[in-house]
Each structure stands twice: as C-alpha cells, then as structure tokens.
C-alpha cells in the first residue's frame, strides 16, 4: 500500500514537473497574440476559418512546442542563477526533478516537431518560429541576459514573434503595416513590463548578478526609459490604422493611459507601488488589445460584408 501511494504521488508530480520545465504559463500567454495575428490575417484576406482548420491546428501545436522548447532550453541554461532567485529556485532543473540531459532532449524534440508542424502551415511560419527560438536561446539566454542592461531589448524580439507566426501560418507575407505594427507593439510592450518586474524583484536580480536596468541604473533612469518606450508605443499604434481605425484607437487609448499612469504613479507612489501598478496595467493592456484584435477580426470574418 505504501509503495503504491508513493508511485501515485510521483505520477501526479510528473505533469507539474513537465509544465514547469516548458513553462506552460508562458506558452498560454503567447498563444493569445499568436491567435490574434492568425485571425487578423484571416480577416485581412477574407478567408473563412473553416477553410484553414488544419493550418490553425498546426499553428497552435507548432507554437506550443516551439515556445515549450524555448522554456526547456532556458531552464537548462539558467539553472545556476535560478537557484539563487526566490521565484525560480523551485524549478525542476534546479531541484533535480528533471536532469539536464532530459531537459536538453526535451527541448530538442520539441524544437524538431514544433518546426515540422509550423512548416505544415507555411515555410515562413516555420522560419519565424526558428528565428524566435534561436534569438531567445542564444543572444538572450546565453549572452545578453547576464552581460548587459539591454538584455530585455534583445530578448524582446523573440518574445514578439507569436503574432507574426500566426499571420504567416495563414498568409506567407508579413509585410502588411498592421502585422508589423502588432509585432513592434509587442516588442515595445515588454520593456515597461519587465522593468516593472525587475524593480519589484530588485534584490533577487542583484543577488544573481543579472544586470537588469533598474538594478544597474536605478529607478529614475528606468522611469525615463519606460516613458520613452510608452511614447514609442503610442506612435506605433498608428500602424494598426492601415487595417482598422477602431483597432488603432483602442491601442492608442491603452498606450496613452499607460503613459499617464507611469507619470502620475511615479510622482504619487513609492517605487514598489509604482512598479506594481505598471505591471498590472501591462497585463491589462495586452489582454484588452489582443482580445480586441481577435474579436474584431472574427466579427469581420463572419458578419462583415
């Protein structure tokens, strides 16, 4: 009885170990912008989703595998600094619940199958998936994260790939201003978002010797740089107007509110509360923007003229 109970407990833990290794939370959050890019392409080119059911399924499966592979590789490489930081010290690669060799092979297999599934949509989607994975693992995880205050900027390009992949899975041309705008918005969005996290986790990053901007340059420099990026975010929102004035206005409003919150909060709150308010609004911003893109696109597909 005792041995059976131990086995059952171990089996219950396996899904959790796998989920933490491939970072299922990040996978879920990235599937939303991927689907936004996908539905926007369907809307732009007046394609019924029912005509593209295989491509839609393959895009989801391929994206899940590629993003999961990135998580596995990141956990594998970062296990030394993850062991120092409170929020990452219980990751399976740190605790030994999964061996480095297993994490490596998991990442390799997920990469191969992820690229295959994306290639079943279009070759461009697979190429973009590979570029995103490579940029996240090599320039970001293996180099810039530990060496420069611009690590967030370098990592942001890979983090902005999902909408491009979604669009490319439907139509193999990502030069339309609307999808370029969505891509750049996702790049810029990451700086205020991750700066806010770094302020709140300042001591952990400092202990792990990770040169995040707030750790190295302080809160005032971070405040200035955050506002610069938010102004850029406002300007880039105009690109969405090439496809929809409504989407452009939603993006403009959200970005202006974010900038106003940053300026007001910095003057009225301590740095911890200011960072928390920016972090919460960053989640609100991205959720509302991409949900609006998806709803607008689907309504246009099914009810548009």
From Swiss-Prot:
Known PROSITE patterns for this protein? UBIA
Q: Give me the segments passing through the membrane.
A: 22-42, 53-73, 94-114, 115-135, 154-174, 179-199, 230-250, 283-303
Primary location? membrane
Instruction: Kindly list the GO CC terms recorded for this protein.
Output: plasma membrane
BP terms from Gene Ontology:
heme O biosynthetic process
Which biological pathway?
Porphyrin-containing compound metabolism; heme O biosynthesis; heme O from protoheme: step 1/1
Top-level taxon in the UniProt lineage: Bacteria
Keyword tags: Cell membrane, Heme biosynthesis, Membrane, Transferase, Transmembrane, Transmembrane helix
Q: Where in the cell is it found?
A: Cell membrane
Q: Which GO terms describe its molecular function?
A: protoheme IX farnesyltransferase activity
Gene3D superfamilies cross-referenced by the UniProt entry:
UbiA prenyltransferase
Principal EC category: transferase
Kindly give the InterPro entries that the UniProt entry links to this protein.
Protohaem_IX_farnesylTrfase, UbiA_prenyltransferase, UbiA_prenylTrfase_CS, UbiA_sf
* Pfam families referenced in this protein's UniProt entry, alphabetically: UbiA
Q: Which reaction does it catalyse?
A: heme b + (2E,6E)-farnesyl diphosphate + H2O = Fe(II)-heme o + diphosphate
Topological type in the membrane:
Multi-pass membrane protein
Q: What is its EC number?
A: 2.5.1.141
**Additional note from the record:** Carbon 2 of the heme B porphyrin ring is defined according to the Fischer nomenclature.
Q: How does it assemble?
A: Interacts with CtaA.
What NCBIfam families does the record point to?
cyoE_ctaB (TIGR01473)
Write out the similarity annotation: Belongs to the UbiA prenyltransferase family. Protoheme IX farnesyltransferase subfamily.
General function of this protein? Converts heme B (protoheme IX) to heme O by substitution of the vinyl group on carbon 2 of heme B porphyrin ring with a hydroxyethyl farnesyl side group.
Its recorded name reads Protoheme IX farnesyltransferase 1
Organism in which the protein naturally occurs: Bacillus cytotoxicus (strain DSM 22905 / CIP 110041 / 391-98 / NVH 391-98)
Query: Could you tell me the gene encoding this protein?
Result: ctaB1
